[in-house]
């Protein structure tokens, strides 16, 4: 069973690597075929979101936390390092020369930049992903209630499909605050939760079988 968790860790690391590589390559003038190939690094986003759902729900199954405890842990592991990076970036003179730098900093600290396209790309376009993952943290109780439904994964898929359809009909498919809203990736996150549930169930079955076999021996 440990090997499977190592696979999840590997997938997380590999997805981060592909995303970083994609942004790095697209910053330089490279041949068209390499540019097209680098775009596949975006698949790492989907893998990471699925792994996030898996890891968070497995942790919840092993040790349930209250909402306040959950947010505190996410604050220390994700939000605090994120804000430190933003503040350090703001101190670099040539990194951000915008006249609205203070507003941009505040938009990251108070998390309202995820709803304004003019602020979304401040301090690096790649920061959009942090906004999306934090949205999942903020609605964690809702995700638990949704997943506890008998067909929660299907509900999540339908919600994501409906959101994607609305975004397309509004002509906002290329607008980051629309196409990267958490509803777009809801089904992937919930699918990760489902896989964690299956993993936990199989672990308990294996442990039970080992107990029944080894105790008589």
Q: What are the language-model segments listed below?
A:
Residues 56-64, 92-95, 142-149, 170, ...:
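Structural signal for the C-terminal ends of transmembrane alpha-helices
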Residues 1-14, 149-152:
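N-terminal membrane topogenic signal
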Residues 17-24, 111-116, 158-172, 214-217:
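Aromatic-anchored segments of alpha-helical transmembrane domains
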Residues 33-45, 118-132, 170-191, 217:
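Interfacial loop-to-helix transition and helix-capping segments at the boundaries
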Residues 39-49, 58-93, 99-112, 134-136, ...:
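Transmembrane alpha-helical segments and their boundary/interface "anchor" motifs
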Residues 134-161, 196-214:
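Solvent-exposed interhelical
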Residues 8-18, 38, 45, 82-85, ...:
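Hydrophobic alpha-helical transmembrane segments of polytopic
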Residues 11, 18-21, 47-49, 136-138, ...:
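Hydrophobic residues within membrane-embedded alpha-helical segments of Major Facilitator Superfamily
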